[in-house]
Regions:
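Structural motif corresponding to the intra-repeat A-B loop/turn of tetratricopeptide repeats
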Residues: 22, 56, 90, 124-125, ...
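TPR/TPR-like (Sel1-like) alpha-helical repeat modules
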Residues: 161-179, 186-196, 206-207
Length: 240
């Protein structure tokens, strides 16, 4: 790049970063497409570009950019992680497996290897028991909301309702609230084992999203009316 090219690149890079901050990945991609990234040496910048392409589901370009970044920084485990994920998105399981082998060489003690191993197993349509075994190994190392819920789902699919219930209860106890706790409550709802308090929490979160607000209010009022009628019936019986 000459001096003018560098200045133009600096301006465009600033625009890209601003668009990424606002999660306008389509807008960012329009600028990204106007630049020859083979001439860029900054690994962080290349990784941002790779993520922009991935966000727009242009996985071929994303993979090419991540490979450029990897060649600039061959010990970058995070780049390898994304190369594995993008390769899986493209259905290139054998390449993902090769990248995974490299990942284990540079990050053999990283618990994330279990997540990657699980994603590869899932892409290979491995048995539910195999997928469960991998996530159980991960859970022994690290207890996280997302992957605990994923494991609970696998238990549910495998028909092991007791393990599913136990794990959902463990998640609710440890994390109390949040996206995956609500998903755990949804699993319990499917099994018909919500407690009274959990049912109230579940309905407050999910019913307004599943049906129009006015219908949700109508259901709540109907339930209140039923409760009131039930209470009055008991009072009447007590006075007889």
């Amino acid at each position: 790049m000459n001096i003018l090219d560098k200045e133009e690149f600096r301006v465009k890079l600033g625009q890209i970063n601003k668009l990424v901050e606002t999660q306008d990945y389509k807008g960012a991609m329009q600028i990204v497409d106007s630049i020859d990234w083979r001439r860029v040496k900054n690994v962080r910048t290349l990784c941002v570009v790779g993520e922009i392409y991935a966000a727009n589901k242009r996985y071929e370009e994303s993979k090419e950019i991540f490979l450029l970044a990897y060649h600039r920084a061959p010990i970058g485990k995070n780049i390898l992680y994304r190369l594995i994920e993008v390769s899986l998105k493209m259905g290139q399981i054998s390449e993902a497996t090769e990248f995974f082998d490299e990942y284990r060489e540079v990050a053999g003690n990283d618990n994330s290897q279990y997540i990657l191993k699980y994603k590869i197993a899932r892409a290979k349509n491995a048995s539910l028991n195999e997928q469960i075994r991998i996530l159980e190994e991960y859970k022994e190392k690290e207890f996280t909301e997302r992957w605990s819920y994923e494991l609970a789902k696998l238990y549910y699919k495998a028909g092991d309702k007791q393990k599913c219930l136990d794990l959902c209860n463990e998640m609710i106890l440890w994390f109390n609230d949040g996206t995956y706790v609500m998903k755990a409550l949804d699993l319990k709802q499917r099994m018909g084992v919500l407690t009274g308090e959990e049912k109230e929490k579940y309905e407050q979160r999910f019913i307004p999203k599943l049906i129009p607000p006015e219908k949700a209010q109508e259901i709540r009022e109907s339930k209140e009316a039923v409760s009131y009628t039930h209470l009055r019936a008991h009072e009447t019986a007590a006075n007889l």
